[in-house]
Amino acid sequence: GNPIKNDKGWKIEKWENVLKIVNGKNQKKVENKTGKYDIFGSGGKIGKADDWLVKENSVLIGRKGSINKPLIVKEKIWNVDTVFGLEPDTDIINYHYLYYFCCFYNFEQLNRAVTIPSLTKRDLLKIDIPIPPLELQNKFATRIEAIQKLKFRKLKSLEKTENSKIIQKFLALK
């Protein structure tokens, strides 16, 4: 069912009951080109760090700027101060389900700024989220991962085919 419309009538919880929001911090003190952890801004990966703030299997959402573009992180990461880390309580909610909920949720409705879109932790914690049985969430996650792997293989195959065509055209010019 649609996680926003909740047409299945699942129990509704506030975010404050099913996840932890991790505030980002300035990365200057932990930044290191050979660091073990990725640094994420609201637009994606921006560097490496020696420390982490957000645990693996979490979701990132922009606090300022790109507020409607969630990201999944499967490893521990450092999030900068323009990004919130969402760490789901894994006894209640699967991170894939949380990610897709965030993809469909309109964070613009919580926007408090006029020029640069901006979200507050207090408003986010009050978001209602339908909670399907964890077993269904996990089945959904398994399907999504299988689809993503298939998509990746198909893209690699297309890329290989395209590269082969380019090489053939180049060799035909000689």
Task: State where each predicted segment sits.
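Non-catalytic DNA-recognition/assembly elements of restriction-modification systems
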Residues: 1-41, 126-174
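Exposed boundary/loop context
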Residues: 17, 34, 55, 105-107
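Structural motif corresponding to the C-terminal cap of alpha-helices
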Residues: 26, 106-109
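A short beta-sheet element
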Residues: 41-105, 112-124
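General helical secondary-structure elements
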Residues: 59, 108, 117, 139, ...
